[in-house]
């Protein structure tokens, strides 16, 4: 296979090799992800997926597909390195995460500013998109939604509309677990 996208395909291939050597029973116990009949059953942002082992392949239940290599790599890394924890009522900003200060500038540009300027004057479109993704409405910001990312890990997306005085802004919060 000739690699065309080094940013996505190289990490994906690396984790596929590690995934093949994974002890599925240990991973199931550590992550709380059911493993039976040669496959993990995992839910990402409300969508159930079946991940086969030892050869990685992913299929959506109910016809949903997960074509994104970064998302597939994320799920492999979860099974390789993740740990299920108890839920938390507390939430942290990206900056408050252990690595947050190091990556805050790219995160702000790629996530927060993009969300603010894509939806800051279109709150109804933001609400429709979040509802379609399975988000639960929150009484926070001008529009806010909570999503179950994976297991007990949740995230909140908050949006404040822009006006004549202030530009739109957004915040993404992660459950503190």
Task: List each language-model region with its residue ranges.
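Short Lys/Arg-enriched alpha/beta "domain-start" segment
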Residues: 1-38, 71, 78-133
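Amphipathic, interaction-prone secondary-structure segments
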Residues: 27-53, 136-161
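Intrinsically disordered, low-complexity regulatory segments enriched in Ser/Thr/Pro
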Residues: 47-73, 160-177
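Conserved binding-pocket/active-site segment within a compact domain
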Residues: 120-177
């Amino acid at each position: 296979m000739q690699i065309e996208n080094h940013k996505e395909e190289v990490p994906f291939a690396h984790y596929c090799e590690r995934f093949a050597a994974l002890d599925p029973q240990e991973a199931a116990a550590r992550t709380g992800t059911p493993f039976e009949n040669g496959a993990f059953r995992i839910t990402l942002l409300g969508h159930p997926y079946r991940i086969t082992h030892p050869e990685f392949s992913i299929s959506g239940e109910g016809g949903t597909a997960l074509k994104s290599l970064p998302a597939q790599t994320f799920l492999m890394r979860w099974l390789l390195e993740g740990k299920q924890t108890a839920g938390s009522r507390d939430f942290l900003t990206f900056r408050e995460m252990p690595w947050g200060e190091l990556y805050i500038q790219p995160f702000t540009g790629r996530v927060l500013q993009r969300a603010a300027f894509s939806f800051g004057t279109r709150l109804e479109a933001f609400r429709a998109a979040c509802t379609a993704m399975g988000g639960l409405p929150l009484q926070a910001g001008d529009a806010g939604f909570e999503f179950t990312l994976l297991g007990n890990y949740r995230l909140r997306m908050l949006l404040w509309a822009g006006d004549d005085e202030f530009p739109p802004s957004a915040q993404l919060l992660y459950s503190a677990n």
